[in-house]
C-alpha cells in the first residue's frame, strides 16, 4: 500500500511539474504577389492544408496572426480543425510593437497552453527570440516550410525546427 501511495505521489508530482507551453511558429504560406496584403497562391493554399495536417495532433488552444490576409488564410484551416479561436495582433506601432504584443499574449496563456503563431519572414525569428529562443535563425524571403516548435517551461526554452509541406525553393 505504501508503494502504491508513493507511486501515486510521484506520478502527481511529475504531472504537475511537466506542464509547459508549446508554441508553434511559422511564416505565412506562399502569396499570389508582392502587394501589401496579398492572398495565398495555390501553392500557399496547399501549404496551409499541410500545416493543418502537420498540427492535427497538436491541439492548439489559440492561433495568433497578423491582420494581413496571408497570415489569416494560412492559419484558418488549423484553427478550424481544432475549433481554436484565432486572434489578430495589430501591426500598428511597427514590427517591434507587434512582436512584443505577440510575446505578451503568449505569456498570458496558461503554462500548459499550445499556441500557433503565423507571422512573416521578418517577424518569425524575432518572435521566437522574444519567447526565449535566442538562437533563432533569420528567415530568407524564399523560405516558407520552416516550423519552429518551442517548449517553454518557466525560464527554460527548447526548440525543434522541422519542415512541413513542399520544400521551399531556397
Please give the residue ranges for each predicted region.
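Active-site-proximal alpha-helix that buttresses catalytic centers in soluble enzyme cores
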Residues: 20-112, 124-130, 135-170
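Positively charged n-region of N-terminal signal peptides that target proteins for export
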Residues: 1-4
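Short beta-strand segments
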Residues: 118-120
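Bacterial N-terminal signal peptides
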Residues: 7-15
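Conserved beta-strand position immediately N-terminal to the Walker
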Residues: 115
Amino acid at each position: 500500500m505504501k508503494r502504491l501511495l508513493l507511486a501515486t505521489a510521484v506520478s502527481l508530482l511529475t504531472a504537475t511539474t511537466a506542464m509547459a507551453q508549446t508554441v508553434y511558429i511559422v511564416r505565412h504560406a506562399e502569396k499570389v504577389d508582392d502587394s501589401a496584403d496579398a492572398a495565398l497562391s495555390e501553392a500557399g493554399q496547399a501549404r496551409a492544408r499541410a500545416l493543418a495536417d502537420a498540427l492535427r495532433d497538436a491541439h492548439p488552444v489559440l492561433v495568433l496572426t497578423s491582420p494581413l490576409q496571408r497570415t489569416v488564410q494560412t492559419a484558418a484551416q488549423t484553427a478550424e480543425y481544432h475549433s481554436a479561436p484565432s486572434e489578430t495582433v495589430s501591426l500598428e506601432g511597427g514590427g517591434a510593437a507587434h512582436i512584443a504584443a505577440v510575446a505578451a499574449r503568449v505569456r498570458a496563456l496558461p503554462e500548459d497552453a499550445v499556441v500557433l503563431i503565423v507571422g512573416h519572414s521578418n517577424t518569425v525569428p524575432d518572435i521566437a527570440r522574444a519567447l526565449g529562443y535566442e538562437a533563432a535563425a533569420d528567415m530568407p524571403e524564399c523560405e516558407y516550410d520552416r516550423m519552429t516548435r518551442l517548449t517553454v517551461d518557466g525560464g527554460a526554452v527548447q526548440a525543434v525546427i522541422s519542415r512541413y509541406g513542399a520544400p521551399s525553393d531556397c
